[in-house]
């Protein structure tokens, strides 16, 4: 879906000479739009914090507190250092998903490059954390408990870890791109009443996909913190 907004035209003009497609340029434009939106909301929510919170502060405290509780419940207290990363990914993916429900807008998570970037961030963080936590012993995560099976287990584990990137990428991309295509079809057939149930379902899908990505990211990072056997 192509949306000829002025800021999209600017990004296309800027990025297409670099060999980036119009779809990729649009995804980058919406990504920066969402980053700016999240920054503005964060500044407004944290400006003049009060012991008795206002509506904006209370709303943000509920969201951030909910994510923090989920991180602690899933990863334990030692998961708190990863809360900023998990919360950032969750909020970015959620807003990216929801923005596609606004007529004329396109979710950057419906572009495979965006979802791949998020997946790579989780993948790299997982192994940096594992190496930092265990040092050379981190390789035990890839060798398994039986010594003579270690070469085969290493090969299988490496494939498994790389498949995480693929699964995180394709799950989010497939669901959001598929939903966008369905919305386009329904808007074309009946542009008023029929798409409304699909848009409501889109809200549910947006929350579920953000939650699944966040949950898997926590599980993967938690796994790298555990002792290898």
Curated annotation (Swiss-Prot):
Identify this protein by name: ATP synthase subunit a
Q: What does this protein do?
A: Key component of the proton channel; it plays a direct role in the translocation of protons across the membrane.
GO MF terms held by the record: proton-transporting ATP synthase activity, rotational mechanism
Q: Which GO terms describe its biological process?
A: proton motive force-driven plasma membrane ATP synthesis
- The family this protein is said to belong to: Belongs to the ATPase A chain family.
Organism of derivation: Geotalea daltonii (strain DSM 22248 / JCM 15807 / FRC-32) (Geobacter daltonii)
Q: Which Gene3D superfamilies match?
A: ATP synthase, F0 complex, subunit A
- Alphabetized PANTHER family for the sequence: ATP SYNTHASE SUBUNIT A, CHLOROPLASTIC
What do we know about how this protein assembles, alone or with others?
A: F-type ATPases have 2 components, CF(1) - the catalytic core - and CF(0) - the membrane proton channel. CF(1) has five subunits: alpha(3), beta(3), gamma(1), delta(1), epsilon(1). CF(0) has three main subunits: a(1), b(2) and c(9-12). The alpha and beta chains form an alternating ring which encloses part of the gamma chain. CF(1) is attached to CF(0) by a central stalk formed by the gamma and epsilon chains, while a peripheral stalk is formed by the delta and b chains.
Q: Topology relative to the membrane, per the entry?
A: Multi-pass membrane protein
Q: Which gene encodes it?
A: atpB
Query: Where is this protein localized, as stated in its record?
Result: Cell inner membrane
Major place of residence: membrane
Say if the entry is tagged with keyword Cytoplasm. Answer: no
Q: Which residues form a coiled coil?
A: none
- The membrane spanning regions, by residue number, are 25-45, 82-102, 111-131, 142-162, 181-201, 202-222
The record, for Pfam families, names: ATP-synt_A (PF00119)
**Keyword line:** ATP synthesis, Cell inner membrane, Cell membrane, CF(0), Hydrogen ion transport, Ion transport, Membrane, Transmembrane, Transmembrane helix, Transport
UniProt GO cellular component terms: plasma membrane; proton-transporting ATP synthase complex
């Amino acid at each position: 879906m192509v949306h000829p907004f002025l800021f999209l035209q600017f990004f296309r003009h800027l990025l297409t000479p670099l060999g980036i497609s119009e779809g990729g340029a649009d995804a980058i434009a919406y990504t920066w739009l969402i980053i700016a939106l999240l920054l503005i909301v964060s500044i407004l929510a944290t400006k003049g914090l009060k012991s008795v919170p206002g509506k904006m502060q209370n709303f943000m405290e509920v969201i951030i507190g909910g994510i923090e509780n989920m991180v602690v419940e899933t990863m334990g207290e030692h998961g708190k250092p990863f809360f900023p990363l998990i919360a950032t990914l969750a909020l970015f993916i959620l807003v990216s998903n929801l923005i596609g429900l606004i007529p004329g807008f396109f979710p950057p998570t419906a572009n495979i490059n965006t979802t791949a970037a998020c997946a790579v961030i989780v993948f790299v963080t997982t192994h940096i954390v594992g190496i930092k936590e265990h040092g050379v012993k981190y390789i035990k995560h890839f060798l398994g408990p039986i010594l003579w099976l270690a070469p085969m287990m290493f090969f299988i584990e490496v494939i498994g870890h790389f498949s995480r990137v693929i699964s995180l990428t394709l799950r989010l991309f497939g669901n959001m791109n598929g939903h966008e295509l369905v919305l386009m079809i329904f808007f074309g057939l009946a542009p008023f009443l029929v798409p409304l149930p699909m848009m409501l379902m889109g809200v549910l899908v947006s929350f579920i996909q953000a939650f699944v990505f966040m949950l898997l990211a926590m599980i993967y990072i938690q796994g790298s913190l555990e002792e290898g056997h």
